[in-house]
Design a protein with these regions (language model features):
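Signature of soluble extracytoplasmic/periplasmic domains of secreted precursors
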Residues: 1-224
Length: 224
């Protein structure tokens, strides 16, 4: 295990020293389902993949490792990226089965200079979609950091599990302003300076939705 941690640390250090730290992650919510995916640029991707495989094999040797968990390495190669999968059965009585269904599927994609991950039904197909979208976007200038949250899918996801009048009021309001439901946090570096400018933005639809939620809460007897 010490060797595994050392290899992971080496990849992290070499990536930082190369001067390029680049990555992205996205969460997709729909009804009672969730999909998570992302990717990162790394230096020494094969070394990182070998370390991950070794760590998993060590875990499999433990007596309490669940035998029902299915792990497959190098299942296929797509655009130079090797895929590995982990499938975890979920008993129907578990709360997680309401979101992921009968099993949790995790896919990992590794190459010389990148690592991708996906958590979704048909996780490899989902991950291929992320890889294709990343390739089609090409190289372009981006902010050092940007976090964008679309509020409507989040509230609809929550509403699929709990019928809440405040949430329902916010959903109705957001649907009157399509595409204006984002909460954005961004970081911009100042020119010729080491200073950073942080910006927090609420789109028009979000502000109105908050107001609608407050009104629904007051009407329902909630104390704000």
């Amino acid at each position: 295990l010490k060797d595994v941690l050392s290899d992971v640390m080496d990849v992290g250090i070499e990536t930082i020293e190369a001067g390029t730290v680049d990555g992205a992650m996205a969460v997709f919510l729909k009804d009672k389902s969730i999909q998570v995916g992302g990717g990162f640029h790394v230096v020494g991707g094969k070394k990182l993949a070998a370390a991950i495989k070794k760590a998993i094999r060590l875990a499999q040797e433990e007596d309490d490792f669940p035998q029902e968990v299915q792990i497959r390495f190098d299942t296929e190669v797509y655009k130079g990226i090797s895929f590995h999968t982990v499938t975890v059965p979920i008993p129907p009585q578990e709360e997680a089965s309401r979101i992921f269904g009968g099993e949790l599927q995790i896919a990992l994609g590794t190459s010389d200079d990148s690592i991708y991950f996906g958590l979704a039904p048909n996780s490899i197909s989902f991950l291929k979609g992320i890889i294709d979208k990343n390739a089609s976007s090409g190289s372009k200038a981006v902010r050092p950091m940007e976090l964008s949250l679309a509020l409507l899918p989040v509230l609809e996801f929550a509403s699929s599990f709990d019928d809440n009048p405040v949430v329902n009021a916010m959903i109705r309001q957001l649907k009157t302003a399509p595409g204006k439901d984002h909460v954005v946090l961004s970081v911009t570096m100042e020119k010729e300076s080491t200073s950073a400018l942080y910006r927090f933005q609420l789109e028009e639809g979000v502000i109105k939705a908050i107001g609608a939620g407050v009104q629904a809460g007051i009407a329902g007897g909630l104390d704000f």
